[in-house]
Curated annotation (Swiss-Prot):
GO biological process terms, semicolon-separated: translation
One Pfam family it belongs to: Ribosomal_S6
Classification via PROSITE patterns: RIBOSOMAL_S6
Lineage: Bacteria, Bacillati, Actinomycetota, Actinomycetes, Mycobacteriales
GO molecular function, one term: small ribosomal subunit rRNA binding
Cited NCBIfam families: S6 (TIGR00166)
Protein known as: Small ribosomal subunit protein bS6
HAMAP family: Ribosomal_bS6
Keyword RNA-binding: yes
Top-rank lineage group of the source organism: Bacteria
UniProt keywords, alphabetically: Ribonucleoprotein, Ribosomal protein, RNA-binding, rRNA-binding
Coiled-coil annotated spans: none
UniProt function note: Binds together with bS18 to 16S ribosomal RNA.
Length: 96
């Protein structure tokens, strides 16, 4: 298993109280495959550097996970299929 940092930018029209419960359904993919969700950091609504899908703001969420590469690919695929997710970025962190 490798450590990853996943940044997700969500639609700003979502209620911020529903962000964590809706992310849990996606994070269950990691847990089901034997991975570990180490941290979920919800930054809240921030201004975007440029418009994405006609939105100037987005709700930023940073997730630290330890999982297999195939599991992270599946998580990224499922997030990108969700209409409320504007953008995702997956980075492998090399914490020794």
């Amino acid at each position: 298993m490798r450590p990853y940092e996943i940044m997700v930018i969500l639609d700003p029209t979502l209620d911020e109280r529903t962000v964590a419960p809706s992310l849990e359904t996606f994070l269950n993919v990691v847990r089901k495959d034997g991975g570990k969700v180490e941290k979920v950091d919800i930054w809240g609504k921030r201004r975007l550097a440029y418009e994405i899908a006609k939105h100037a703001e987005g709700i930023y969420v940073v997730i630290d996970v330890k999982a297999a590469p195939a599991t992270v690919s599946e998580l990224d695929r499922q997030l990108s299929l969700n209409e409320s997710v504007l953008r995702t970025k997956v980075m492998r962190t090399d914490k020794h």
